[in-house]
Structures are given as structure tokens and as C-alpha cells.
């Protein structure tokens, strides 16, 4: 009997350890670590609990929950006081069934089904469909190739079809209405002519291009008015195809005599020796742009060479020493730096000193104390 209280005390100690919470104690002190008014153990008790504003999952369990992506069973999970509870073994029977909202595959079988992506063979005769492929007699290669141009039944069949009466590739389809045309009883809608526009787009039958102008010719839509100054002028009959109407000017009595061909440059020259037939004049500039006849490039410098205006001004040859002296001189056309000096100039990138004499004088008048102090330093 004395051993029983000892066992009870040990069991109480185990229960106390199972329900114990983690506490962080500070070395040298017996008090648990606090965060504000709460201990760390008290704060960690709610780590696995969703706060109330998001709902409450305390005491909840995921028992009997389906996996991710499993459709919800809305047939057996209905809670109602009028319905009897379904036993567990009955519930487990429906796990392999598709729910009624998606249809049902109960009593279904995949027997005889082909693999995924396998084409369906619907060309076999009905009496041989149930035979296994191993029981079928092999076909000759000639018989197999006879069906290469046949579309299978699942897509329809083109057997005994013909392209008779079909139009060529890219030809627009003419879906004409099958009706009786009282005005044109000889017109057959089933076999329209290639040169005729079908009726749904209008028709050009009996049409003519008589009186039509050529391609690219501008249309002359003149106003039908009576010209009191020229009563003989008729807008409908007076306009000739070769005459420009008066509103754009007139080319009446005009001539193209002496005109050059299309795209040919005009030669406004007075010298008959300059001609496109004379190869000697191919390098000449025509008079309308000036002329370079008898011109020469003698004494011209190369491309990019600066002009030496000093040499041209003196009109003589310079010695080698004098030519070297003028290499640092900017010619007159760009200005003149002769006699200049860089004395007092700052280095490259140095800020400019804008405190000139005028600004310094204003500064001395406004700040005399600082001006005297600067003079004392000197």
C-alpha cells in the first residue's frame, strides 16, 4: 500500500511535465523573463492559435479531411437533425466514385480502352471489333497502303469524293442565294461565270468600259454650269482627254518638242559641245549649276587640310623656320591669336574668377570690416 502514493506522486509529476510551458529565466534571478506585463511562456501558448478576428481553430482537428484538390462530398457530409448518421464503412465506399454533380462512373470499366494519345481504330468491320489484335490476320502491305489517302470515320471520310467543280487555291468562295431571277432567267446561280460578279456584290453583266479613261488618269469632275462669258463652252463635250481643264490651267497648243525623256536631267547649256552624246562633257557641271570648264585643281590642298591664308597673302614661299613659327598661329579666317598670351589664365577645369575689380569694390563698400581684415593678412 505505501507504494501506491509514490506511484500517484510520480504520475502527477509526469502530468505536470506534460502540461509545463517553456520559461526563460535570467541567470542569478528566479523570475521568468517578461515581455511587458506577460511572460515569454504565456506569449508562446498562443503560437498555434488563429486569433479571433480571423476565426478560431482552437480544439479543431483535420481528422477525415480530404487531400488538397479533392472534390468536396456534398452528399454524405450534410448535417441535419432529420437525417440518420451514415456509418463509416458506408462512407468509405464512395471514395472511388465520381460525385453526381460531375456524373458517375459507377460500374464503369476501362476494359478494351487504348492508351492515352492512341488513335482510335474505327475502320475495322463490326464483326471483328471484339477480336483481340493478336487474333487478327496480318494484312499485306499493298492493302495497308490502299487506305493511306482515306480519312478515318471519326473525322468523316473522303472516299468516292471528287474535286470536280472546285475552284483553285485562294479563289474567293461565291455563296450565292438560290433564287429565281425573273429579269435574268438564263442566269444559273449554281455555275456562276468567272468573269461575272455575283449578285450579292452586284453584277457587271452587260457592263462596258466604253468611255472610261486609262489607269492612273485623274478624274475630271466638272460642275455643270452655264458660262455666260463663253456660251460655246460645254462642260460635257468640250473636255478633251489631252486637254487640262481651265481650273488647272491649259496645255492647249503646247508641245513637247525638245523635251528630254523621263528622269533625264535638263541641259540648259549654250555650248553645243556639251551633250550627253559627247563623252568629253560627262565631267562638266551644267550652266544652270555653274560650270567647271577650264577649271583645275592645281595648287589645291588635300581633303581636310586647313587653308593657309598667311601664305596666300604674302604670295611667296616661306622658309622652313618661318613655316614652323606659324604652326601655332590660328589663321585669319578663324580669328587671330598672334601676340596673345595665357598669362594669368587658370588651368583646365578651374572655376572662373568672377570677382573682378567692380565686384571687389562693391564688396569692400558693403563689408568694410572683412575688407580690412583681408588687407591685414597681406
Curated annotation (Swiss-Prot):
Kindly state which keywords UniProt assigns to this record, in alphabetical order: Repeat
Q: Indicate, by first and last residue, each region the UniProt record lists as having compositional bias (Low complexity).
A: 1-20
Provide the tissue specificity: Found in the longitudinal muscles below the hypodermis.
Q: Which residues form a coiled coil?
A: none
Polar residues: bias regions: 238-256
> InterPro entries attached here?
Calponin-like (IPR050606), Calponin_repeat (IPR000557)
Query: What family is this?
Result: Belongs to the calponin family.
Q: What else is known?
A: There are apparently several forms of the native protein which appear to be expressed in a stage-specific manner.
Q: What is this protein called?
A: Calponin homolog OV9M
Organism name: Onchocerca volvulus
